[in-house]
Swiss-Prot record:
This is Adenosylhomocysteinase. The keyword Magnesium does not apply. Its EC number is 3.13.2.1. The gene is ahcY. Pathway: Amino-acid biosynthesis; L-homocysteine biosynthesis; L-homocysteine from S-adenosyl-L-homocysteine: step 1/1. It is an enzyme of class 3 (hydrolase). Its cofactor is NAD(+). Substrate binds at residues 64, 136, 161, 191, 195. SUPFAM superfamilies: Formate/glycerate dehydrogenase catalytic domain-like (SSF52283), NAD(P)-binding Rossmann-fold domains (SSF51735). Keywords: Cytoplasm, Hydrolase, NAD, One-carbon metabolism. Its main location: cytoplasm. CDD domains: SAHH. GO terms for cellular component: cytosol.
């Protein structure tokens, strides 16, 4: 790809595809904002209270319309923020342009950027000398710890959005290299129950359909992994008429999948049966040579985990006599036997490579968690030991309350009698 040179707009540095795309980006950011009432209320409060005044912040996220609303809220709160992409294929170039042109937020992200550019953008962001990091997959946090040790003393904390990133943070903590607090946004109830399940389920199928235009009814879809993302993907595939097989390594989750009505088997048994394969595990080489060898001619494989490692594309490429693009985000690998296997989105997140990511309504809660986690870190600066912290229950519940309010839904509350009963141990049979 051609790398766009770093440009300056009234001393604002940025690296995006085309700033003239800003009007389209603004329209779409505002449209997304209509479905994000919680982030809107947080932004309005931040604008008055300025909790991030004097704070330098890096946000490493998918550069989407929803992320834009988060970035705007953080800037309203006084943050000196820089935004970079957390995936080379997930950037929406018109959104990046709007954030630079209309909101003065430095963005370093181009859809389709190569790995060298992606990692250079991480370094540029770290040159901002952040106090707070919003991470999505852990790349910025890991790079800071490995290559920028002299900057660690300035870090108040980091927040992490993904299962993959939390796994990496736990490994950092185990190795004794995580020397500041990290907020586990991924495991907040108002995040994983909705973003991971309903968001991933809908957006993954959206990306697959946009990339291929295949009819899912009657197809056999193999979902690798039955965490919240896998549950959502399996549920939505079944809703579109697919016969769904689940593969798992966790016995409890496998039982859950069976009792939810899905067939469960090892990947080597599912491989000859599947028409479409979706990996949502967060692990490496879930689909590998022994699976490719027994797949049907024309089988489609894609990933909706975080990194492009779940499908062993290097091995598939070595087996292929020809690789050609047959549609946007759709590559056909022809093997020596004459059989073809179709890979979507270069094995990267199909929901962001070929579609627009999760719907705004679920990202509203996820990004509310990010914003309030950042505020929590600032309020508790110097009070938290290095480690991984869950989102406080009161913040989680407040986000849920605000979301219900935005949806026009009210719920019951405990009566004094019920509260007394729940706090008593003397009443029995």
């Amino acid at each position: 790809m051609t790398v766009t040179p770093i440009r300056a707009k009234e001393e604002l540095k940025y690296e995006i595809k085309d700033i003239s795309l800003a009007p389209s980006g603004r329209q779409r950011i505002e449209w997304a904002g209509r479905e994000m009432p919680v982030v809107k209320q947080i932004k309005d409060r931040f604008e008055k209270e300025k909790p991030f005044e004097g704070i330098r912040l890096i946000a490493c996220c998918h550069v989407t319309t929803e992320t834009a609303n988060l970035a705007i809220a953080l800037k309203a709160g006084g943050a000196d923020a820089v935004l970079i992409a957390s995936n080379p294929l997930s950037t929406q170039d018109d959104v990046a342009a709007c954030l630079v042109a209309d909101y003065g937020i430095p963005v370093f992200a181009i859809k389709g950027e190569d790995n060298a550019t992606y990692h250079r953008h991480v370094q540029i962001a770290l040159d901002h000398k952040p106090n707070l990091i919003i991470d999505d997959g852990g790349d910025v946090t890991a790079t800071l710890i490995q290559e920028r040790k002299d900057q660690i003393a300035d870090i108040i904390g980091t927040t992490e959005e993904t299962t993959t990133g939390i796994v990496r943070l736990a490994a950092m903590l185990k190795d004794g290299v995580l020397s500041f607090p990290a907020m586990n946004v991924n495991d907040a109830d108002t995040k994983h129950f909705f973003d991971n399940r309903y968001g991933t389920g809908q957006s993954t199928l959206d990306g697959i359909i946009r990339a291929t235009n295949v009819l899912l009814a009657g197809k056999t879809v193999v979902v690798a992994g039955y965490g919240w993302c896998g549950k959502g993907t399996a549920m939505r595939a079944r809703g579109l008429g697919a016969n769904v097989i689940v593969t798992e390594i966790n016995a409890v989750k496998a039982i859950e999948a069976v009792m939810d009505g899905f067939r469960v088997m090892p990947m080597i048994e599912a491989a000859p049966l599947g028409d479409l394969f979706v990996t949502v595990t967060g692990n490496k080489h879930v689909i590998r040579p022994e699976h490719f060898d027994v797949m049907k001619d024309g089988a489609i494989v894609c990933n909706s985990g975080h990194f492009d490692i779940e499908i062993d594309l290097q091995s598939l490429g070595e087996k292929a006599s020809e690789i050609k693009e047959v549609r946007n985000f759709t590559q056909q690998y022809t093997l020596a036997s004459g059989k073809s296997i179709v890979v979507l989105g270069e094995g990267r997140l199909i929901n962001l490579a070929a579609a627009e990511g999760h719907p705004s309504a679920v990202m509203d809660m996820s990004f509310a968690n990010q914003a309030l986690a950042c505020e929590y870190l600032v309020k508790n600066k110097g009070k938290l030991e290095p480690g991984i912290y869950n989102i406080p229950t009161e913040i989680d519940q407040e986000i849920a309350r605000l979301k219900l309010q935005g949806m026009g839904i009210s719920i019951d509350s405990l009566t004094p009698e019920q509260e007394a009963y729940l706090n008593s141990w003397t009443s029995g049979t």
